[in-house]
């Protein structure tokens, strides 16, 4: 019963957190209609539902590295005409990476997991799991870059990119060497906990985006997590 109440509480707080984001997008950035939205790290479709409910979207492309999650998405959204689901892993270059597929799939990541993390222990306790439950398994996944995907699919302008890839956000942005000039707005999540071993800091992302003419306009802490969500917009010429 306690676990059920906790999950309900988290759901409610997440709802208000997301509402804060969409209110900013609409009221401050004046974004109501979108031609192309890239949803990177689609998971089980949370952001697909969120953006579809709140914005008028002509075309959404959702990327999900996990084959299992992608199969789920293709079944769930088989009748959604403005949605393309891609079982592709995006990174800074083409190749292969080891993907840590977690039983609690929202934590799946290309980053190395710190098994001694206090945050991980708290999370596993919250989910009523133990290390004996094989919390994650390793898979080799092929990667590509956003530059290559956009070029191959003749996409020359993107209104909004959302990135939530559990510690791989910077690598994805680095795969935008050419086409970053064609992106208008970027929403991404950044972890400050010790569960994920990242080889970059928030300052690295911030400096990269500033160098490419983006400005940070929004920051909000995610409920009950050591993570923040940020919004950056392209500077007007």
Regions from the language model: what does each represent?
Residues 1-237:
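Phosphate/nucleotide-binding beta-alpha loop and adjacent structural elements of enzyme active sites
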């Amino acid at each position: 019963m306690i676990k059920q109440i906790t999950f309900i509480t988290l759901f409610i707080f997440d709802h208000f957190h997301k509402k804060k984001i969409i209110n900013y997008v609409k009221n401050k950035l004046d974004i109501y209609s979108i031609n192309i939205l890239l949803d990177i790290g689609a998971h089980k479709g949370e952001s697909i539902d969120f953006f579809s409910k709140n914005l008028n979207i002509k075309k959404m492309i959702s990327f999900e590295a996990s084959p299992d999650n992608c199969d789920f998405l293709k079944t769930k959204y088989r009748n959604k005409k403005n949605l393309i689901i891609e079982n592709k892993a995006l990174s800074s270059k083409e190749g292969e990476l080891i993907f840590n597929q977690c039983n609690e799939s929202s934590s799946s990541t290309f980053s190395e997991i710190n098994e001694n993390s206090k945050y991980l222990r708290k999370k596993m306790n919250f989910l009523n799991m133990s290390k004996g439950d094989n919390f994650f398994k390793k898979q080799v996944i092929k990667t590509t870059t956003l530059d290559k995907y956009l070029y191959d699919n003749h996409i020359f302008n993107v209104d909004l990119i959302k990135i939530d890839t559990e510690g791989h956000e910077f690598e994805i942005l680095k795969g935008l060497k050419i086409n970053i000039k064609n992106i208008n707005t970027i929403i991404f999540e950044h972890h400050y906990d010790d569960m994920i071993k990242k080889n970059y800091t928030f300052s690295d992302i911030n400096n990269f985006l500033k160098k490419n003419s983006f400005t940070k306009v929004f920051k909000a802490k995610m409920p009950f997590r050591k993570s923040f969500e940020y919004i950056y917009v392209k500077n007007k010429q």
